[in-house]
From Swiss-Prot:
Residues 17-195 form the Guanylate kinase-like domain. It comes from Streptomyces kasugaensis. This is Guanylate kinase. The gene is gmk. The lineage of its organism: Bacteria, Bacillati, Actinomycetota, Actinomycetes, Kitasatosporales. It catalyses: GMP + ATP = GDP + ADP. It holds the Pfam family Guanylate_kin.
Length: 205
């Protein structure tokens, strides 16, 4: 089954590169979609976030995240060096502004995978950013995905479900919605959207 669009708007073919932001509720499959997209098309540039979270086994500085302490993160915020930032589970995460702007200036399409709070901040600071909402096929499917992980306590799952309802209600704030019925299909649709924003030709494969 193909991924489906809701609320698309035609974009002129000569449009300059625009920042593409992918957001959606927890459990909808954002990371899976992005990972698949970058496996098939490694030329897609995904912004690496800065975080105060401690590295997990196998994670490398500058690859999964830029790992910084609280003092360094405070400086990034104070100096306006973050395009957006948010706190989650006691740790802070933020998108370095300069790296994103440098890539856009070079004419490259840029992808951010962030939460609703971050997407709203990006919209405020970069009004021409293209916000893409990744939605589940149904609420029941999202509940199944969140409860099927089997790695979290019931109270955490309840908090995630409550947050998901708030995030789903914010869908109308986004420029376009992709329904995640298939990782392969929705990755292809996301790539097509990014290329459409930059005026590039589609990439087959």
């Amino acid at each position: 089954m193909a991924a489906t669009f809701r609320g698309t708007t035609p974009v002129p073919p000569d449009a300059r590169p625009r920042l593409t932001v992918l957001s959606g509720p927890s459990g909808v499959g954002k990371s899976t979609v992005v990972a698949h997209l970058r496996t098939v098309h490694p030329e897609v540039w995904l912004s690496v976030s800065a975080t105060t979270r401690k590295p997990r086994p196998g994670e490398q500085h500058g690859v999964q995240y830029f790992f910084v302490d609280d003092e360094e993160f405070d400086k990034l915020v104070a100096n306006g060096e973050l395009l957006e930032w948010a706190e989650f589970a006691g740790n802070r995460y933020g998108t370095p502004r300069k790296a994103v702007l440098d890539r856009l200036e070079a004419g490259e399409p840029v992808l951010l995978e962030i939460d609703l709070q971050g997407a709203r901040q990006v919209r405020e600071s970069m009004a021409d950013a293209h916000l893409v909402f990744l939605a589940p096929p149904s609420w029941e499917e999202l509940v199944r995905r969140l409860t099927g992980r089997g790695t979290e306590a019931p109270e955490i799952i309840e908090r995630r479900l409550a947050a998901a309802k708030v995030e789903l209600a914010a869908e109308t704030e986004f420029d376009v919605t992709l329904v995640n019925t298939s990782v392969e299909d929705v990755s292809r649709e996301l790539l097509a959207l990014m290329l459409r924003q930059s005026g590039e030709r589609d990439i087959s494969g």
